[in-house]
Amino acid sequence: MIGFLKFALIGTVLLGVANGASVATASAKGSNCTVQDGYAALMCLVRLSDFAEKVDNLDMNDKTKLKEFKRSCDSLHSCYSNLNCTTKSDDEKDKYVESIKQYCDAVVYVSDGFSKCSDKLNEKKSKCFDDWDPIPNKIHLEEDEAKIEKIKNEACKTYFGKDDCMKKEITETCGKEEWDSFRKQFVNLSGGLVSKCDFSRFE
């Protein structure tokens, strides 16, 4: 499961925040940015690099590494929250900052809060759980924006597995409370992975 979370990070979080910070460093030469702003943006890029490395080396079973990852998350989130000079609008900046938080929360949840249920699903060799991947198929290979949006729209139908099988699997195996927590985490994360889906069918 951590595999697609890493892909989600690269595709929807890192590219966005890296662009925001790199623009800030370039813009520091302009009239709207100070040298201090440019330095702050560079620090964010350094923290982003550290964060990406921790994601790549993350061992979900190593509690020490998870704590380090969480600290890196908090540091990166704080850095971008306080970044003043960027050509991104406040709304765009807030979106990227929130995406960092959502991604980090999802990783911590999967590695800690959902681990027991995940073990149970693996033990019963759940086909739905094994096959589940909310990342739209081959979207990373597509460059046409219109086609990307179409793929994302289609992904809404299978975001929680074929015929929403993840709801049934998790509820039957781990209970409704676990499903509610799982649904909440991944609905929050969905904005960067797929189009704005209507998940009211789960309410």
Curated annotation (Swiss-Prot):
The family database entries (InterPro entries) matched by this protein are listed as: T20D4.11-like_dom, UPF0376
Q: Where is the signal peptide?
A: 1-20
Localisation per UniProt entry: Secreted
**GO CC terms of this entry:** extracellular region
Attached carbohydrates are found at N32, N84, N188
Has the keyword Glycoprotein been applied to this entry? yes
Keyword Iron part of the UniProt annotation: no
What superkingdom heads the lineage? Eukaryota
Q: Which family does it belong to?
A: Belongs to the UPF0376 family.
PANTHER family from the xrefs?
DUF19 DOMAIN-CONTAINING PROTEIN-RELATED, DUF19 DOMAIN-CONTAINING PROTEIN-RELATED-RELATED
Protein's name in the database:
Excretory canal abnormal exc-13
Q: Which organism is this entry from? A: Caenorhabditis elegans
